[in-house]
């Protein structure tokens, strides 16, 4: 029930930051951790699906005719890519840490605004949860006498039971909709307030902190340049690791093409 209330609240508060109000049950996860998790899942899925596609191709008539032996080199390619990820990990972590450090002040100001709005809307959320629980209890009491009829199980009884339950379901739906509308009405001013505060922060940063914006831009550019320089050795290692695989692919393909050409000439 609590999760339902919190989910509804999020629908009325704009911005992805609003969901962090009530994430108290899970350990905090840094943006970098979320990025790493996403990239890891994506790369692993891509690697597995890619191997499946290669396997299907080599099993096809054309794949057997070309005999490129792509699967023989697959482990080498994935090993090289994994090595690249390991080498770039610390470099990218450093870039993200620097970016977080540079924007710490702005993020603290925005977090303060969010906490203030949260404190204002909490009573409305508590009231909504209380009314929702009361509605569910009332519905349960009305449905309880019908359970005995359900056990009889005849088609006629089931049809009659459905006719009795339908009005109750519609009543609960209408009352829940009324509570949701009331909650939306109560939260609307605070949602607008949150938007206005955020807009004011950004406008102040734009008008009075032009130098800060320029500084953020300069530092971000500097960090990206540093990341690019530090990534060059790892990318070169990747290129060197892939060269034997590409050369093997080239030789196999040309050999298959030559053999196919000879077959055409003899026909």
From Swiss-Prot:
Cellular component aspect of the GO annotation: chylomicron; endocytic vesicle; extracellular vesicle; high-density lipoprotein particle; low-density lipoprotein particle; spherical high-density lipoprotein particle; very-low-density lipoprotein particle
Protein name per Swiss-Prot or TrEMBL: Apolipoprotein A-I
Location in the cell: Secreted
Region annotated 10 X approximate tandem repeats, chain positions: 68-267
Family: Belongs to the apolipoprotein A1/A4/E family.
Sequence repeats: 68-89, 90-111, 112-122, 123-144, 145-166, 167-188, 189-210, 211-232, 233-243, 244-267
PANTHER family assigned: APOLIPOPROTEIN, APOLIPOPROTEIN A-I
Species in which this protein is naturally found: Macaca mulatta (Rhesus macaque)
GO annotation terms (biological process): acylglycerol homeostasis; adrenal gland development; amyloid-beta formation; blood vessel endothelial cell migration; cellular response to lipoprotein particle stimulus; cholesterol biosynthetic process; cholesterol efflux; cholesterol homeostasis
GO molecular function: amyloid-beta binding; apolipoprotein A-I receptor binding; chemorepellent activity; cholesterol binding; cholesterol transfer activity; enzyme binding; heat shock protein binding; high-density lipoprotein particle binding
Record's function text: Participates in the reverse transport of cholesterol from tissues to the liver for excretion by promoting cholesterol efflux from tissues and by acting as a cofactor for the lecithin cholesterol acyltransferase (LCAT). As part of the SPAP complex, activates spermatozoa motility.
Record's signal peptide: 1-18
Gene that produces this protein: APOA1
Upper taxonomic lineage: Eukaryota, Metazoa, Chordata, Craniata, Vertebrata
Sorted UniProt keywords: Cholesterol metabolism, HDL, Lipid metabolism, Lipid transport, Lipoprotein, Oxidation, Palmitate, Phosphoprotein, Repeat, Secreted, Signal, Steroid metabolism, Sterol metabolism, Transport
Keyword Lipid biosynthesis: no
Post-translational modification: Glycosylated. Palmitoylated.
Modified residues annotated as Methionine sulfoxide in this record: 110, 136
Subunit structure: Homodimer. Interacts with APOA1BP and CLU. Component of a sperm activating protein complex (SPAP), consisting of APOA1, an immunoglobulin heavy chain, an immunoglobulin light chain and albumin. Interacts with NDRG1. Interacts with SCGB3A2. Interacts with NAXE and YJEFN3.
């Amino acid at each position: 029930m609590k999760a339902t209330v919190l989910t509804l609240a999020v629908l009325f508060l704009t911005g992805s930051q609003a969901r962090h109000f009530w994430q108290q049950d899970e350990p905090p996860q840094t943006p970098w951790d979320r990025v790493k998790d996403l990239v890891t899942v994506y790369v692993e899925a891509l690697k597995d699906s890619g191997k499946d596609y290669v396997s299907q191709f080599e099993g096809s008539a054309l794949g057997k005719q070309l005999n490129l032996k792509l699967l023989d080199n697959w482990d080498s390619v994935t090993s090289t890519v994994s090595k690249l990820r390991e080498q770039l990990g610390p470099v990218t972590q450093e870039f993200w840490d620097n970016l977080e450090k540079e924007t710490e002040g702005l993020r603290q100001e925005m977090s303060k605004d969010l906490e203030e709005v949260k404190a204002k809307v909490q009573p409305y959320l508590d009231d909504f949860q209380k009314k929702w629980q009361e509605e569910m209890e009332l519905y349960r009491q009305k449905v309880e006498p019908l359970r005995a009829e359900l056990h009889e199980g005849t088609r006629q009884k089931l049809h009659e039971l459905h006719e009795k339950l339908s009005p109750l379901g519609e009543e609960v739906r209408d009352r829940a909709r009324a509570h949701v509308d009331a909650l939306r009405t109560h939260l609307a001013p605070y949602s607008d307030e949150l938007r206005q505060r955020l807009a004011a922060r950004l406008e102040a940063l734009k008008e009075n902190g032009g130098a800060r914006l320029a500084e953020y831009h300069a530092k971000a550019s500097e960090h990206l340049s540093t990341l690019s320089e530090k990534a060059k050795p790892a990318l070169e290692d990747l290129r060197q690791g892939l060269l034997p695989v590409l050369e093997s692919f080239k030789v196999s393909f040309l050999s298959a093409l030559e053999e196919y050409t000879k077959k055409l000439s003899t026909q």
